[in-house]
Amino acid sequence: MEFWFSEFHTPDVKHSIRVNKQLYSKQSDYQRIDIFETPEFGRVLTLDGNVMLTERDEFIYDEMIVHVPMAVHKEAKDILVIGAGDGGVVRELTRYDRVERIDLVEMDPQVVEACRAYLPGKACRMDDRRVHIYFENALKYIRRCEEEYDLIIVDSSDPFGPSEGLFTREFYGSCFNALKEDGIMVNQQGSPFYAEDASAMQRSHKRIASTFPISRVYQAHIPTFAAGYWLFGFASKKYHPIDDLDAESWKALNMRTRYYTTKLHIGAFYLPAFLEEMLREVEEH
């Protein structure tokens, strides 16, 4: 008998992955956490039935949410990561010798526990001396911060359920206040393809654009995410994501990546016409 995991992208569309076995399942105080072993994508983490990562394509998301801002802000040393309990963002950040502090704020300790046990390739740098983990509500945490961080990475789940508060105008305003005078915030903005996701993306972008003087959207292609097409937000007090990219300095780090390159960095901000139109709709109102 075959066992398949299916995630509904809309009521009429679902994405299915054949499963060899279920490795972990637990209902935490916040969400259901499952980890599956699959023949095609390796181990797969889901939260409340939504794919958060697979071993096969996780590098795409983590490299794009980390290396894009790090290649622009060459002096980023103090970094706040919100969400990202799987450890992938931390793994990429610890590759930079200049980073002095990584504060990770994760709501659900069970996510960290599960990923340490079953996804060691993701959680392998969570014990780095520069990493400080705080299990608390990110909204409450960020309100206490003022001009403290060079970079904030918001690696939340989708803007529904437990993470809904991380897509509000209040939250983005708190992030602005928590950044130093040349700080950058990046966040995942979901897929623009299906109607519900597209509306959530537009709301998020409108709120960010009204908060930060520089606000852009960039893209990546992630096979196991909705429609295989994913967006990130880049918001900054000072730096432009393309004009202030120092490609030669980043290349000099000799950092091996599987997805990110400085050429791709530039190309990721060149968006298809339908998406440019969607963004203009909210920027002009």
Task: Explain the meaning of each model-derived region.
Residues 1-34, 227-285:
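SAM/dcSAM-binding transferase cores
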Residues 182-189:
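Conserved beta-strand signature within the Rossmann-like core of class I S-adenosyl-L-methionine
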Residues 1-52, 57-63, 67-70, 74:
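N-terminal accessory segments
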Residues 220-224:
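Short proline/glycine-enriched turn/loop segments at secondary-structure junctions
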